[in-house]
Amino acid sequence: MGRPSSGAVGQPKVRKGLWSPEEDEKLYNHIIRHGVGCWSSVPRLAALNRCGKSCRLRWINYLRPDLKRGCFSQQEEDHIVALHQILGNRWSQIASHLPGRTDNEIKNFWNSCIKKKLRQQGIDPATHKPMASADTATAAAALPDAEEEDRKPLCPAVDGSLVPKQPAVFDPFPLCVDYGAGFAEELGAANAAALYGQLCGGKEVADDDAGFGAADYSCVLDVSENLGYGESSSNSSNWNYGGEVGSVLDGEVPHWAKAEPAFAEMERQQQHSPAEQKLSLPCQEQSLLASFDFNLELEPYF
């Protein structure tokens, strides 16, 4: 029942472990007389209690007549380092370039001797590059922002020191100081004229030698005659000045230079007027201003 083991009754047991000098002599004499044949039949023909794989490795690595014995020379060591830099850990290909040396022998010599020598010289055995340069490359890759910050241009600060120059930021509303005071005054006058034109409902503004001329304010203060305001919380009197405002301002011209006496007169009249008349609407205040004499002279504004 089952498959019989190789160590069955009547069959010699396969030996493992170190080879004895007698076994080396039997294998060597058999290969010299009969040559290399089928390795699975060599143990039976050479009267060895070994497997075919063990006989093959023993012949290739230790018993071949062309194998070199002894330590590696300095020339062989340099050759191994140069080949390892190109081929890496391909030991069989490296051994093909070194007659008389096996791949196992070269691998053991690399791990036990050559690798330690390279590290003592400051060379990485895996990359064959100086360890200092490898550390420098790693540090440079880890700090790209610091190098980018160093490459930024510097500009002088207020105290005389150099600070990094800030990038230019787009300003949708640039200042007009670079264009001179005249440009700013013209721009202010143009904006005032445009704003007044919008208040007048799109009507054109008359422009004379002084800058502003007579204008029709009836479009701004056009109040219906039938418009009445309700009673306030403190007085029940009914105000109805809409028609009077339109008739008073018809043909009048404002004089901005003499506005201060007008305001003073308006305050004086309000102080002597009854208490129920002190609360006034914006259109009613304009009607008081329109009753004064305005001329067309304008004083320069700075």
From Swiss-Prot:
Region (Disordered): 137-158
InterPro entries the record matches: Homeodomain-like_sf, Myb_dom, Plant_SW-associated_TFs, SANT/Myb
Encoding gene, per UniProt annotation: MYB2
Classification via SUPFAM superfamilies: Homeodomain-like (SSF46689)
Domain HTH myb-type: start-end pairs: 11-63, 64-118
Main location per the UniProt record: nucleus
Gene3D superfamilies the record matches: Homeodomain-like
Tissue: Germinating seed and apical meristem of shoot and root.
SMART domains: SANT
Membrane-spanning segments: none
Source superkingdom: Eukaryota
Annotation: DNA-binding region: 39-63, 91-114
Protein name per the record: Myb-related protein Hv33
Role noted for this protein: Possible transcription activator in response to an external signal. May be involved in the regulation of flavonoid biosynthesis.
GO molecular function term, any single one: DNA binding
Intracellular or extracellular location(s): Nucleus
Cellular component, GO annotation: nucleus
Keyword annotations: Activator, DNA-binding, Nucleus, Repeat, Transcription, Transcription regulation
